[in-house]
Each structure stands twice: as structure tokens, then as C-alpha cells.
């Protein structure tokens, strides 16, 4: 488990941002998990249609689009090959005598993608349908106005952890450590009512508040109605975390850099700014640093020859056990 790294792990579905990336421009390039998967892609928008295309020229492999822009065509800067905004080959100089040109293979390949509201996911491997992966999240939170959530780059972060990616996920997948590691967070949550379940490649954890302040105003027909839900934590296997609070959403993407180094990208989406520093969704920087400290301690400890492995708490480590089963299933 702990040695899975790079493309061996992060080859499935990936959150890459939201439709606001194409609000001013109709072309937005990026690289899928740079340093691991290293797949150049470009999002394009034609009318209301959003596509994800390979950003590699089918002629000689050059990156086609270097910057977000507004354009009618995609043009390779190496030899001038042009593509329509939908990726189809449009024009290539000095190719008049080439037989069977252009063909399907000269178009920019499409990369499968899907959306939940404004959220965009790349489907990089068909081991699991995106609908299956985010289905439990959509079902539980379909009432939330995701379209109103606004990305805030100033509140977004990148953290570097000196520990294996799986250890970081292990820690995220249980609330067992909250009373011991997160003293402030523990003051806001009812520890005995903390809920965890594994559903279809997803782990859901629900934090229940000690009072009804700073909790979700749930619809009367919702399955959690009547509970003081302070946070919904969704883990989408193998490396995405969607944390919903009354103020909005924090998306965390786990990026293994080496067997003992992990990078965590935080994407912050604000819904109700006035609730930002209240309840379970407050002090997220502090909570993250507390998690990093304990996970780095585990990384040091598991190197000991005296340590083999521990057993699972059937009550408190449901998510960790489910995560390990999914790794065995897919890898």
C-alpha cells in the first residue's frame, strides 16, 4: 500500500477546477498531476459546450496551447498546424501531397470529462465511472446550490508533507484522533456521534455539532434532517477529499511526490463568507498542520523493525479499513 506512488496510484478520475476557468477565456491549458501522470490537456469552450482535449500536437508532439486565452483556433507554434476549437484538424502547411490527410488520428484526442454543477472532473481511467464515484456525494448534497460556490485563490493552499500519501489518507479517514490531535475542533463536534461509512469507492464521514449553531440548514425531507450536521467529509478514492461546511467547500487533492513525500492542494470555494471562521469549518490551516505533524510522526515510526501493523477499531476505523480494501481491489 505505502509504496504505490505516481501514475500507479493517480491514474483515475481527477478534479481539475470549475467552469469559471472558462468565464473570460475559451481555452485553458494545464497538466494533469504534473510530476506524476504528466498528461497535458486543454479545456475549450464553444458556446455552452465544454470539452477536454489532449494539448499535444499530433504532428511532432509539441504543446499546442501554452496559456489561457480567447481564440477561434488552436495553433501549434512549432510548424503551424491548426485545430478547430473542438480539436478537429483544420490546416497544416506543406502537407498537400500527404496521402489520406487529414485522418481521424490527426485530430486532438478527446479526454473524457464530466461535471457536477460547475465542478469539472477528468476521467483518466475507466476503472470506475465518474457517476459512480461522485454519486453518493451528489445524492447526499443535491440540495446544495453548488453553482453559487465561488473559488477563492487567496484562501487556497499547497501543503508539503514528509510522509507517504496513504498515511495521509489513513489519517483523514477516521475521526478517532480528533480528541487527541485537534483540541479546538473537538470542542465543536460530538465525538460519540461521529459517523463513517464506505459507499461505492467513496468514504463518507459526518461531523455532528455540539449545538445547532454553525450547522447545515437541511431540507425537511433530507435523511439527515434533525441532526446538527457541522461537516460532510467525502473521500473519493484514491486521492480526492471534498469537505463541505456551512460556509462552502474545501477540495483537497493528494499528490504523491515520492514514497515519503506528499503534496496536498487545497481548493477553497466560498458560499457564505460570514460563516468562514465558525464551527467545524474554522481554523483549517491549524487543523492541517496538526494532521501533518502526526502523520510525519507515523512515517518515522513505521520504519521501525519492531513495528509490523496494528489492528482496526471496528467502531472508529471503518474508513481506513475500507480504503485499504479498495487499494487491494484496484491495485
Where are these regions (language model features)?
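General beta-strand structural signal in soluble alpha/beta enzymes
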Residues: 16-18, 66
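C-terminal catalytic domain of Rieske-type non-heme iron oxygenases
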Residues: 23, 44, 55, 114, ...
Amino acid at each position: 500500500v505505502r509504496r504505490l506512488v505516481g501514475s500507479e496510484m493517480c491514474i483515475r478520475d481527477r478534479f481539475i477546477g470549475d467552469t469559471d476557468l472558462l468565464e473570460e477565456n475559451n481555452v485553458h491549458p494545464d497538466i494533469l498531476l504534473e510530476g506524476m501522470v504528466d498528461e497535458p490537456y486543454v479545456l475549450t469552450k464553444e458556446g455552452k459546450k465544454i470539452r477536454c482535449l489532449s494539448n499535444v500536437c499530433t504532428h511532432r508532439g509539441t504543446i499546442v496551447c501554452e496559456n489561457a486565452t480567447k481564440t477561434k483556433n488552436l495553433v501549434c507554434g512549432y510548424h503551424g498546424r491548426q485545430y478547430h476549437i473542438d480539436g478537429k484538424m483544420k490546416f497544416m502547411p506543406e502537407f498537400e501531397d500527404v496521402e489520406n490527410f487529414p485522418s481521424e488520428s490527426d485530430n486532438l484526442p478527446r479526454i473524457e470529462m464530466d461535471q457536477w454543477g460547475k465542478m469539472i472532473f477528468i476521467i483518466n481511467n475507466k476503472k470506475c465511472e465518474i457517476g459512480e464515484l461522485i454519486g453518493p456525494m451528489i445524492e447526499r448534497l443535491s440540495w446544495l446550490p453548488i453553482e453559487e460556490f465561488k473559488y477563492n485563490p487567496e484562501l487556497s493552499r499547497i501543503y508539503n508533507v514528509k510522509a507517504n500519501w496513504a498515511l495521509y489518507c489513513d489519517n483523514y479517514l477516521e475521526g478517532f484522533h480528533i480528541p487527541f490531535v485537534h483540541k479546538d475542533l473537538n470542542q465543536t463536534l460530538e465525538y460519540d456521534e461521529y459517523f463513517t461509512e464506505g459507499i461505492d469507492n467513496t468514504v463518507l464521514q459526518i461531523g455532528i455539532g455540539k449545538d445547532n449553531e454553525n450547522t447545515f440548514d437541511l431540507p425537511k425531507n433530507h435523511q439527515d434532517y434533525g441532526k446538527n450536521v457541522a461537516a460532510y467529509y467525502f473521500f473519493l478514492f484514491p486521492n480526492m477529499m471534498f469537505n463541505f461546511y456551512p460556509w462552502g467547500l474545501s477540495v483537497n487533492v493528494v499528490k504523491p511526490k515520492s514514497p515519503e513525500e506528499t503534496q496536498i492542494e487545497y481548493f477553497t470555494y466560498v458560499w457564505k463568507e460570514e460563516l468562514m471562521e465558525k464551527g467545524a469549518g474554522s481554523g483549517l490551516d491549524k487543523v492541517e498542520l496538526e494532521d501533518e505533524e502526526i502523520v510525519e510522526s507515523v512515517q518515522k515510526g513505521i520504519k521501525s523493525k519492531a513495528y509490523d501493523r496494528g489492528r482496526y477499531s471496528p467502531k472508529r476505523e471503518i474508513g481506513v479499513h475500507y480504503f485499504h480494501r479498495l487499494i487491494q481491489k484496484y491495485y
